[in-house]
Amino acid sequence: MSVSEIFVELQGFLAAEQDIREEIRKVVQSLEQTAREILTLLQGVHQGTGFQDIPKRCLKAREHFSTVKTHLTSLKTKFPAEQYYRFHEHWRFVLQRLVFLAAFVVYLETETLVTREAVTEILGIEPDREKGFHLDVEDYLSGVLILASELSRLSVNSVTAGDYSRPLHISTFINELDSGFRLLNLKNDSLRKRYDGLKYDVKKVEEVVYDLSIRGFNKETAAACGEK
């Protein structure tokens, strides 16, 4: 094989990979659009009357996740399953955003942390890499950390809306998250930096709870703060 033939063959490989990446990008754009729609819907809980609409907004968000499932099913067909990490950077950020959105819905519904397995059911993907298109552990953790930031904001807006018990519940939840993350030996630089922001979320929520306790707005909050 001549030098020119070698490079012609290599160009064929490069062109084929570029075609795959372009197909992936198209699906990811659709995923990003649906994620924005879900986020816009859930952001409404921060408004004055948004707390009254939480069940309705969560139900509507779950309907949007059926569209997410469709897009992810399409994405799976765009590349060989064994090459997941070769193209992972294309959907990594939107998948982390979708984890956050799924976790936010579950928290609003039950005030609990969604498991990685439950997220994969909501998204219609696999929990284990051996089974193909899956939810990477670090992507799940990144989504959970985004949730913590969102909940710290919600604690402030809860007070504005006159819901004085919610910040206490959020404080308990975020402190449990912080304790959980302390058990992990995080090697990923991006994940470590995002985890560094969790302490500020914890502090922000604790300040809200403390402010409520000294102002006597909530007996439950005051009693909890007195126990600390």
Swiss-Prot record:
The modification Phosphoserine is found at S190. It is found in: Cytoplasm; Nucleus. GO terms for cellular component: cytoplasm; endoplasmic reticulum; endoribonuclease complex; male germ cell nucleus; nucleoplasm; nucleus. Its main location: cytoplasm. Residues 86-90 are annotated as: DNA/RNA binding. Keywords: Acetylation, Cytoplasm, DNA-binding, Endonuclease, Hydrolase, Nuclease, Nucleus, Phosphoprotein, RNA-binding. Disulfide bonds: none annotated. Transmembrane segments: none annotated. Residues 177-198 are annotated as: Leucine-zipper. DNA-binding protein that specifically recognizes consensus sequences at the breakpoint junctions in chromosomal translocations, mostly involving immunoglobulin (Ig)/T-cell receptor gene segments. Seems to recognize single-stranded DNA ends generated by staggered breaks occurring at recombination hot spots. Exhibits both single-stranded and double-stranded endoribonuclease activity. May act as an activator of RNA-induced silencing complex (RISC) by facilitating endonucleolytic cleavage of the siRNA passenger strand. Ring-shaped heterooctamer of six TSN and two TSNAX subunits, DNA/RNA binding occurs inside the ring. This is Translin.
